[in-house]
Amino acid sequence: MVERAASSAADAVFLDLEDAVPVGDKQQALLTAVDAIERLDWGRKTVTVRINAIGSPFIEHEVHRLAGLSRLDAVLLPKAERVGDVSALGETLATHRGNRSEALDLELLIETALGVVNVDALAAAHPSVSALHFGVGDFSASIGARSNEIGLSPRDYSHTGAAADNHVETPQDLFAYPMMRILIAARAFNLRAIDGPFGAFRDSKGTMSSAVKAAAMGYDGKQIIHPLYCFV
């Protein structure tokens, strides 16, 4: 699977050490990620690793092991919420950069209510912060939304209608506010804004609609689950 990602048409790839990895497999996942980063030909892709969250027993070792890799471009911090944590992580990346001329970039996954509330301060928390991602799945859980699919509003959530011709309803209206908050913070601090994935990846129409909406809002990119959609 990692080899397919390296040879895909994607502009960027992130290797996951967090949600996709069971607790008992964390160490092996880190070793696999390091091997792939150093061994595979990634071309001109941006290569990122999603590390575990602040407070995890795994994050310190992950950061120390990844910080000096020459072919790695960034780490993605999930559940970013507090300025002090982001600032400290940025300093750790700089301290452990080894022979790199510059420290790794730090990308932030905004996926909780507190993260959205603090997003402006998080965007400015450290000079290494380069991008803000919207984590729609965990955000839904954070606010108590009854969503069945990542990236879709709950079935019971709908507008009653409006007379205005320019009123547009989409399945993602529930997420318009956090998406805009994240986008505004990214633009204010000259960062990239990346939308989260559309969970029902076999639904090509839904995936396209989700990507088009994010692009229309001004987002710079979108996470995808399947390489089939790299052309979007």
Regions found by a protein language model. Name each.
Residues 1-232:
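Expand to "…catalyze enediolate/carbanion chemistry for C-C bond making/breaking, isomerization
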